[in-house]
């Protein structure tokens, strides 16, 4: 099967936004215009195509990033719809990793909102080129110029309009294209037909000023054009488009468009802008990877290069089982072929290859460089794994996911639910790298941990709906951590003699703080005093021991361990003995190393009308919060702070009550910090250690 669309005519794009900016509605309109759906589904009616999970349709928010393929003006779009709620930031993170460009959707009344800032930061980390669509221009209070200003003020990004809306609120009727200096009026019908009109005289001067500014900004990205501009030459439309495109692909300049997806205004022009300005797979830098020799190499977006891809999402499908979504960076993959999961060093067979449209699927024979598809039959592949040609091994840069910050206990309602619950939890954990599940050694309870209360609510809900498992849920609890503040050295010696063959394990380990670097293991044993096999066992034993800290039983983080000495017994040494010896060394050294309890600190942003500003400031301070600043947003104030998570339970209700429902907040994990002594003592006391 030959490639239908060239790499130049391929766009891998994401749609990203704050919750309620109209992102899913915008995606729906895109799918309608690109011929993928025949009846538009409205999010507020629970009929949206991309929001295909039952929970998403009930709550009207997008939880998992559904991938779909669509076509526009001889260009193939692979579109990923991403969630706007902070608890699902991991979905955004993994989508951005495999995309070439994105459309950031803003609310025309609010401009840049807190979650927009979070998603924008993530996109900047991955240098994803973006265009901005200011949506809801029909909404009361919509202000296009204000929204554009917030991009510079709040995101520090260089943005300029390439359109100017004609009218606003209920009088929003069309736009002026500032690149071509033409005006268009929309008919507001689902087909979104528009006709060219004269530029309204009351907007002509403003349009000319904005175009002059656009030209000034754009020519900076093309040296020849800049010289021509400085010499007073006229910049043609095609030259201007080319310069804008260069700035966008550089992830340095962000053109802004206007519209109202719900009212069928401006989405077709947005599609044209995706084709004109966002990059194809060959416009962006080639992906880098590591060869088995340790050498760094590039893989170019080309069908003739060896196959390489990144698995970015795993889902359990009720009909076909485990689906692995992947982005092909180079080469071609044919169904039925064998590939290597180089991350796990395991061979995998690709049973079927599916092209996805939300939760519908089309089976295809092969996928090409630059494509996004889903595979059936990959048994051992998880999110972030590299898939490649067996004869041309490479490991691509993986994804880093935040640690869960909130946990709760889960109990099956009946004996029949017990077995189903463990199957359901393992499948859900396989899908979502920020969701963890484990059994508490002391209580025997099943614990689930995630990024927020909504995240865990939806996990419990999915267990009930998809796996038919009924559970009793405990109150949410904070996931504390432990660490050490001083270095220490200890010996762990495990000797057990019981009749015949005994057990012998002996290690000497030096420990030291390893702030913000996680666990690190260094082997400094010389002369073969302990074999590599037993050194590895000691490492495994130590990692297991670190899962249950020494003062309150919470996982210990940021510890560097160097094994410096030890010994073996020619008959009695075994792997288990070295695992136990390493954990004994940790317990022995722990008290000397000033172990402390760490608590999660959250970035909290509260937006309230001016009259509640003082109340909120006082309230945050009473929660051990550190105020970092505030800014005026219209007639409201946004207060930025860092607050311990333990103080934030039930905050939504609290904020609602003292602002009469007029305040809102967002909360995102920032870092772990040492808990004050009084708090730590309370945590240790509760743990019963």
Swiss-Prot record:
Any one Pfam family match given in the protein's UniProt record, by short name: GTP_EFTU
InterPro entries hit by this protein: EF-G-like_DII, EFG_II, EFG_III, EFG_III/V, EFG_IV, EFG_V, EFG_V-like, G_TR_CS
Binding-site residues, GTP: 17-24, 81-85, 135-138
Residue span(s) of domain tr-type G: 8-282
Cellular component, GO, one term: cytoplasm
Subcellular location as annotated: Cytoplasm
Keyword Lipoprotein: no
Domain of life: Bacteria
PROSITE patterns tied to this protein: G_TR_1, G_TR_2
GO molecular function annotation: GTP binding; GTPase activity; translation elongation factor activity
Family named by the database record: Belongs to the TRAFAC class translation factor GTPase superfamily. Classic translation factor GTPase family. EF-G/EF-2 subfamily.
Function: Catalyzes the GTP-dependent ribosomal translocation step during translation elongation. During this step, the ribosome changes from the pre-translocational (PRE) to the post-translocational (POST) state as the newly formed A-site-bound peptidyl-tRNA and P-site-bound deacylated tRNA move to the P and E sites, respectively. Catalyzes the coordinated movement of the two tRNA molecules, the mRNA and conformational changes in the ribosome.
Protein name as it appears in the record: Elongation factor G
Organism of this sequence: Mycoplasma capricolum subsp. capricolum (strain California kid / ATCC 27343 / NCTC 10154)
Gene: fusA
């Amino acid at each position: 099967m030959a490639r239908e669309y060239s790499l130049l005519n391929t766009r891998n794009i994401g749609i990203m936004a704050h919750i309620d900016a109209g992102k899913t509605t915008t995606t729906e309109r895109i799918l309608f215009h690109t011929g993928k759906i025949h009846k538009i589904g409205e999010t507020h009616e629970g009929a949206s195509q991309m929001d295909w999970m039952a929970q998403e349709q009930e709550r009207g928010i997008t939880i998992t990033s559904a991938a779909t393929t669509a076509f526009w003006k001889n260009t193939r779009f692979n579109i990923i719809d991403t969630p706007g709620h902070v608890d699902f930031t991991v979905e955004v993170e993994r989508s951005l990793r495999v995309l070439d460009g994105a459309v950031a959707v803003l609310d025309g009344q609010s401009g840049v909102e807190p979650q927009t800032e979070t998603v924008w930061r993530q996109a900047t980390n991955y240098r994803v080129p973006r265009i901005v669509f200011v949506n809801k221009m029909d909404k009361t209070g919509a202000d296009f110029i204000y929204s554009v200003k917030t991009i510079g003020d709040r995101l520090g990004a260089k943005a300029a309009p390439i359109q100017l809306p004609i009218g606003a609120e209920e009088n929003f009727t069309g736009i002026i294209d500032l690149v071509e200096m033409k005006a268009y009026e929309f008919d507001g019908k689902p087909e979104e037909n528009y006709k060219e009109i004269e530029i309204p005289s009351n907007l002509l001067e403003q349009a000319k000023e904005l175009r002059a500014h656009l030209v000034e900004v754009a020519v900076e990205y093309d040296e020849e054009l800049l010289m021509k501009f400085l010499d007073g030459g006229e910049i043609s439309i095609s030259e201007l488009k080319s310069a804008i495109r260069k700035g966008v692909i550089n992830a340095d300049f962000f053109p802004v468009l206007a519209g109202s997806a719900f009212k069928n205004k401006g989405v077709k022009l947005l599609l044209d802008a995706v084709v004109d300005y966002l990059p194809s797979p060959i416009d962006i830098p080639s992906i880098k990877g590591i060869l088995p020799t340790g050498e760094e190499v590039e893989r170019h977006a080309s069908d003739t290069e060896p196959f390489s891809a990144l698995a970015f999402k795993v889902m359990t499908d009720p009909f076909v089982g485990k689906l692995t979504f992947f982005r092909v960076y180079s080469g071609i993959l044919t169904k039925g072929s064998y590939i290597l999961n180089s991350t796990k060093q395991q061979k995998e067979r690709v049973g079927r290859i599916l092209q996805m449209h939300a939760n519908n699927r089309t089976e295809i024979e092969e996928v090409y460089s630059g494509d996004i598809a889903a595979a059936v039959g990959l048994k051992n592949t998880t999110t972030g794994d590299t898939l490649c040609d067996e004869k041309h091994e490479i490991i691509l840069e993986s994804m880093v996911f935040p640690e869960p910050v909130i946990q709760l206990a889960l109990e099956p309602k009946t004996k029949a639910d017990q077995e189903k619950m463990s199957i359901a939890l393992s499948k859900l954990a396989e899908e979502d790298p920020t969701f963890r599940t484990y059994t508490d050694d002391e209580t025997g309870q099943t614990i689930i941990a995630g990024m927020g209360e909504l995240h865990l609510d939806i996990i419990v809900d999915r267990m009930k709906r998809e796996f038919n498992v009924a559970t009793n849920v405990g109150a949410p609890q904070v996931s504390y951590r432990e660490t050490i503040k001083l270095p220490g050295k200890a010996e762990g010696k495990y000797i057990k003699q019981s009749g015949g063959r005994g057990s012998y394990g002996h290690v000497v380990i030096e420990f030291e703080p390893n702030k913000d670097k996680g666990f690190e293991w260094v082997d400094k044993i010389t002369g073969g005093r302990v074999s590599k096999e037993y050194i590895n066992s000691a490492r495994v034993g130590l990692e297991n021991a670190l899962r249950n800290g020494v003062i309150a039983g919470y996982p210990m983080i940021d510890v560097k361990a160097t094994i410096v000495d030890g010994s073996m017994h020619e008959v009695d040494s075994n792997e288990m003995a070295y695992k136990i010896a390493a954990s004994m060394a940790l317990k022995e050294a722990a008290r000397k190393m000033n172990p402390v309890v760490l608590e999660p600190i959250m970035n909290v942003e509260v937006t309230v009308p001016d009259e509640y500003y003082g109340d909120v400031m006082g309230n945050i301070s009473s929660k051990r919060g550190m105020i970092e600043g505030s800014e005026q947003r219209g007639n409201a104030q946004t207060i930025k702070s860092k607050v311990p998570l333990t103080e934030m339970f039930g905050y939504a209700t609290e904020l609602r009550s003292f602002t009469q429902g007029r305040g809102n907040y967002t909360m995102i994990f920032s870092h772990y910090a040492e808990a004050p002594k009084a708090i730590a003592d309370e945590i240790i006391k509760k743990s019963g250690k």
